[in-house]
């Protein structure tokens, strides 16, 4: 059976593993999931990730990050644009997550980037998710 929203599945796997305080989570890979993982790593929400080629779709392995006393670095992840209801924003209308404490992940013509990068490049796009 095919999956309706693979991005939501990936974000849910990361959220659930984070809540259960797992060190590693695996999900089926895709280019957009790899881009999302790169953003999460660059913004300091995860330790690292790796792509594992299994001669099929591939697997993306995400290494979660925790603070002192195993406090969660990712407080929340929310999928915004869904297959049944896409959400787009112009460059000047891009949302700020928790007044700049979180990030919005945006799919633009310049690739998958954060809301801060999209504002500086003056590009809008599809608002994939919020992470805080």
Curated annotation (Swiss-Prot):
According to the UniProt entry, its GO molecular function terms are: rRNA binding; structural constituent of ribosome
Coiled-coil features, chain-numbered ranges: none
NCBIfam families documented for this protein:
PRK00136.1 (NF001109)
Record InterPro entries: Ribosomal_uS8, Ribosomal_uS8_CS, Ribosomal_uS8_sf
Which UniProt key words apply to this protein?
Ribonucleoprotein, Ribosomal protein, RNA-binding, rRNA-binding
Entry's Pfam families? Ribosomal_S8 (PF00410)
Which GO BP terms sit in this record?
Answer: translation
Protein name (database record): Small ribosomal subunit protein uS8
What is the purpose of this protein?
A: One of the primary rRNA binding proteins, it binds directly to 16S rRNA central domain where it helps coordinate assembly of the platform of the 30S subunit.
Q: Which HAMAP family match?
A: Ribosomal_uS8_B
Q: Which family does it belong to?
A: Belongs to the universal ribosomal protein uS8 family.
PANTHER family per the UniProt record, alphabetical: 40S RIBOSOMAL PROTEIN S15A
Describe its assembly. Answer: Part of the 30S ribosomal subunit. Contacts proteins S5 and S12.
Q: Name one GO cellular component term.
A: ribonucleoprotein complex
> Organism source for this protein?
Leuconostoc mesenteroides subsp. mesenteroides (strain ATCC 8293 / DSM 20343 / BCRC 11652 / CCM 1803 / JCM 6124 / NCDO 523 / NBRC 100496 / NCIMB 8023 / NCTC 12954 / NRRL B-1118 / 37Y)
């Amino acid at each position: 059976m095919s999956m309706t929203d693979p991005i939501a599945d990936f974000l849910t796997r990361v959220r659930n593993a984070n809540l259960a305080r797992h060190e590693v989570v695996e999900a089926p890979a895709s280019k957009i999931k790899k881009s999302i993982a790169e953003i999460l790593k660059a913004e300091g929400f995860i330790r690292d990730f790796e792509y594992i080629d299994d001669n099929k779709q591939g697997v993306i392995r995400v290494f979660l990050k925790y603070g002192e006393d195993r406090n969660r670095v990712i407080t929340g992840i929310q999928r915004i644009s869904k297959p049944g209801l896409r959400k787009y924003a112009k460059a000047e209308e891009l949302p700020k997550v928790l007044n700049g404490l979180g990030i919005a992940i945006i799919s633009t013509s310049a690739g998958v980037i954060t809301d801060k990068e999209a504002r500086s490049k003056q590009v809008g796009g599809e608002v994939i998710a919020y992470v805080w």
